[in-house]
Swiss-Prot record:
Zn(2+) binds at residues 15, 18, 34, 37. Pathway: Lipid metabolism; malonyl-CoA biosynthesis; malonyl-CoA from acetyl-CoA: step 1/1. Residues 11-534 are annotated as: Carboxyltransferase. Its main location: cytoplasm. Residues 244-557 are annotated as: Acetyl-coenzyme A carboxylase carboxyl transferase subunit alpha. Its EC number is 2.1.3.15. In the N-terminal section; belongs to the AccD/PCCB family. In the C-terminal section; belongs to the AccA family. The lineage of its organism: Bacteria, Bacillati, Actinomycetota, Actinomycetes, Micromonosporales. Residues 11-280 form the CoA carboxyltransferase N-terminal domain. Component of the acetyl coenzyme A carboxylase (ACC) complex. Biotin carboxylase (BC) catalyzes the carboxylation of biotin on its carrier protein (BCCP) and then the CO(2) group is transferred by the transcarboxylase to acetyl-CoA to form malonyl-CoA. The gene is accD. It comes from Salinispora tropica (strain ATCC BAA-916 / DSM 44818 / JCM 13857 / NBRC 105044 / CNB-440). It comes from the Bacteria. It is an enzyme of class 2 (transferase). This is Acetyl-coenzyme A carboxylase carboxyl transferase subunits beta/alpha. It holds the Pfam family Carboxyl_trans.
Length: 566
């Protein structure tokens, strides 16, 4: 149970998490987070604004919500009397405060709910105020930030309170349609109609540490099911494990996290190509192809591509990119560990990166399912690609997988459909896409992240319709014939450059990437920049048309023309 911020005049407060007696000034200095157990006290709207926005930047929006008592509700008190008491007790007109502000210099419209006001319940006035905030964000083309704290719909307004879920959601939909970013911050508690609408249908969902969120509250669930609930049920950490939120952030880091997201959303950094020419060397297709055409045996290349010392996607994100904020979850119940992705910065430009994650040790590999994505992993990648399209961010994918997860569970959850939807979406994504095969490119699991404007490949990576072992077992049939199958499959970077599947080969430090990971990661950084920069200048319609034409040439007619040209 989360503790409540102490009332004015109290010198001491008892933590609701660990029962420690805390000096109030010390608690305030620690942002109302218990220094003993880390429990986060609830904050009122003014305190939350003071924590999140730049000092002096907040300007309240005009309160144009009319006084409403739509159904003349009376319980032990008439509804208007409850409103009067809530206003007197909080000093607020309603359960939400809306205005314009900046966060680390990035402009936004922000709406902060206050649980003290009738449990932060969603009624007609609250719905109207948040809708007006979204409309202001749309008019100004600045991100909308919503900080939620609510028990759900306001019962005293009957079914009209239910309608606010749709009213605010369609305002969020208008932001999506126009490419205006939206971010929600879930604080404790967020339930019912708020959880099932604007708290979770924004572009990015952040949960403050320990915050609880759900459609039905725990008491209702216990009553209906007659079962005890697991420890940590509906907490932020539970939601993260189950793919419902992008991030769980402690209060002291919340402002910085929000600032990073808003900067990426607004693209408020120096564009690549202006002041970064030294990191964008021209690409000589013939020389890169020639470099990839080494004499190493195909089977030896397969073994190098699988070496556990090769840089992983998280290694690249730490070294080849300037910053990275990981975004989690497919929003449908899972967060696949074999796929990682999020917002990164590359030479001053916000980009979205998504890739397969393996690991360097047996434990890492097992925890990441050896880089074999489940349907949840593919759907996470799909969600992030669509986010990039809405925010106008280029996409970089890093491919290193033996293939998609072939398990029974994956088939039950729609593996084929998940891969198919990724391929379909990437063919028409209205933003530049650069794919890099960094290790293994295994079958449809690889292609699900490799439908791109430019496909690059590390010198000792492989890309194939099937593993050599699988091919040998089916066609020879003898798994020991895997080396022969590797040669026959034409899966090396040199082979794929000649076939036109790969646009350029990224040289590896001798003898291979795992001998000098920093050099390999720097080479990938330079190659991605070299291929991404020209794409940023291509109009969207032309970009998509060229991407489709690129893959159309792999039809029989296109391959026949290539053979004739040779």
């Amino acid at each position: 149970m989360n503790p409540t911020t102490p009332r004015g005049g109290q010198l001491w407060s008892r933590c609701g998490g660990c029962a420690s007696l805390l000096y109030r000034k010390r608690l305030r200095r620690n942002l109302d987070v218990c220094p003993e157990c880390g429990a986060h006290s609830r904050l009122d709207a003014p305190a939350r604004l003071a924590q999140l926005v730049d000092p002096g930047s907040f300007t309240a929006l005009a309160d144009r919500a009319p006084e409403v008592d739509p159904i003349g509700f009376v319980d032990v008190l008439p509804y208007p009397h409850r409103l009067t008491a809530a206003r007197s007790g909080t000093g607020l007109a309603e359960a939400v405060v809306c205005g314009t502000a900046t966060v680390a210099g990035s402009r936004c419209v922000i709406a902060v709910m206050d649980f003290r006001f009738l449990g932060g319940s969603l009624g007609c006035a609250v719905g109207e105020l948040i809708t007006q905030a979204a409309e202001r964000a749309l008019a100004d083309r600045v991100p909308l930030v919503v900080v939620t704290a609510s028990g759900g719909a306001r019962m005293q307004e009957g079914v009209l309170s239910l309608m606010q879920m749709a009213t605010v959601s369609q305002a969020v939909a208008a932001l999506r349609e126009s490419g205006v970013p939206s971010v929600s911050v879930l604080t404790d508690p967020t339930y019912g109609g708020v959880a099932a609408s604007f708290a979770t249908n924004t572009d990015v969902v952040i949960a403050e540490s320990g915050a609880r969120m759900g459609f039905a509250g725990p008491r209702v669930i216990r009553q209906v099911t007659g079962r005890e609930l697991p420890d940590g049920f509906q907490t932020a950490e539970f939601l993260l494990r189950h793919g419902q939120v992008d991030l769980v952030v402690p209060r002291h880091a919340l402002r910085g996290c929000l600032a990073t997201l808003l900067a990426a959303a607004s693209g408020g950094r120096e564009p690549v190509g202006a002041g970064h020419e030294s990191e964008c060397p021209p690409v000589d297709g013939s020389s890169t192809q020639e470099r990839g055409a080494d004499k190493r045996d195909a089977w030896e290349t397969v073994r190098l591509a699988r070496h556990p010392g090769r840089p992983t996607t998280l290694d690249y994100l730490e070294t080849a990119f300037d910053s990275f904020v990981e975004l989690h979850g497919d929003r449908l119940g899972a967060d696949c560990p074999a796929v990682v992705g999020g917002l990164a910065e590359l030479a001053g430009r916000p980009v979205l990166v998504v890739g397969h994650q393996k690991g360097h040790t047996t434990g890492d590999l097992m925890s990441r399912n050896f880089g074999m994505a489940s349907p949840a992993g593919h759907r996470k990648a799909l969600r992030l690609a669509r986010l990039a399209a809405r925010w106008g961010l280029p996409v970089v994918t890093l491919v290193d997988t033996p293939g998609a997860d072939p398990g029974v569970g994956a088939e039950e959850q729609g593996q084929a459909a998940a891969i198919a939807e990724n391929i379909l979406t990437l063919t028409m994504l209205p933003t530049p896409v650069v794919a890099v095969i960094t290790g293994e490119g295994g079958s449809g699991g690889a292609l699900a992240l490799a439908v791109a404007d430019r496909v690059l490949m590390l010198e000792h990576a492989v890309y194939s319709v099937i593993s050599p072992e699988g091919c040998a077992a089916i066609l020879w049939p003898d798994r020991s014939a895997a080396p022969q199958a590797a040669r026959a499959l034409r899966l090396t970077s040199a082979d794929l450059c000649r076939l036109g599947v790969v646009d350029a080969v990224v040289p590896e430090p001798a003898p291979a990437a795992h001998h000098d990971p920093p050099a390999a990661m720097q080479a990938v950084r330079e190659a991605v920049l070299a291929h991404l920069v020209p794409l940023l200048e291509v109009p969207t319609a032309t970009l998509v048309r060229r991407r489709r034409r690129r893959f159309r040439r792999f039809g029989a007619a296109g391959l026949g023309a290539r053979a004739g040209a040779r």
